[in-house]
């Protein structure tokens, strides 16, 4: 596995804060995990703590380009486990689980909403918007820290287009559609090509065919040699044989 390479654009994405964040114990875990992930070249997406079958701490992370491999999850787990043991943000035994966001991923940053504009999303508000906490619709334009949503669950007398403040959102998750799956596959192929290129495994592009120099030279066609067996030449040769003229008269 190659560690994520951080360019100027990636550095900006790594430093971008989350606008949709967790409360309580998950927030304490986030305060510990976030800097570690950023230092490794990853972005924290979400932390979820569940008590089913014991306590599980699930940490979703991704590379700046949105990709995430099994090797990335393993590397994060190895680096983060001892840090969490020392910081001890959870007062009971737990199992650490590192995962990718998945196709129907949570949206937590401004760039997430921009990246998935035109896709369907379900939104749960922490702070009600016009008396309503649940929305579903198509992601529209982003204005600062607010996002337009064209609702598909609108009822009579309700506004179809709403403008939601991201910091008031408790959860926003993409809805699995054929369009989203196709987009995810396209992004996955692009990320795989980039990884192969970084590893030197991507075959070089086919060289452009070189045009023959013969076809590019601006040369004049060669003159055909003058004929040397014309009637004039034969008569001159006969006269020269007789000694009547010089032998080169036929030229």
UniProtKB/Swiss-Prot annotation:
It holds the Pfam family DUF150_C. Residues 217-234 have a biased composition (Basic residues). It is found in: Cytoplasm. Keywords: Cytoplasm, Ribosome biogenesis. The keyword Cytoplasm applies. Residues 198-251 are annotated as: Disordered. GO terms for cellular component: cytosol. The keyword Cytoplasm applies. CDD domains: YlxS_C. HAMAP family: RimP (MF_01077). This is Ribosome maturation factor RimP. It comes from Bradyrhizobium diazoefficiens (strain JCM 10833 / BCRC 13528 / IAM 13628 / NBRC 14792 / USDA 110).
